[in-house]
């Protein structure tokens, strides 16, 4: 490795998963490929009419979910936990799948596996940026202490207690990431910070929670 004129070894980025699901482990290759789609995603949402259309889907999706038996709070919190799966759903509703595929296809993504890779990358990115106090707070939530407090005191109606429980679970899941995924994301934290900052608080009208 230290010999004169020795060629640097190519970094092992791991296996590139081309048909990712919600349970497929992240690799550095997956994270790098996702990052390479972010400039195209930013260009995709640069048109004002596109933004307006996708924002309008927020209410329509909540209405549709509620009509199909999904609690409106759950519908919104699913968007908070998995924003990229919500974006994929909006793209399908808007009939823009082929247009979006031109962006993510450059990295050999399909729409659904791009969404899964995106959501797992964001969760791992959030998790790797947690401080000690935030980790402690999450552990308190995971152990159910907040649930017990909500049930113990009679300040809330049953509906309000259920809403609080949904929210607590959503907070936990927003930062839920395993060690493998976090290690895949860690080398790209700076690049992710730079690329994601251009979106601000949302992507295509979908809330984006960043560290």
Question: Could you say what each language-model-derived stretch is?
Answer:
Residues 131-209:
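Long, compositionally biased
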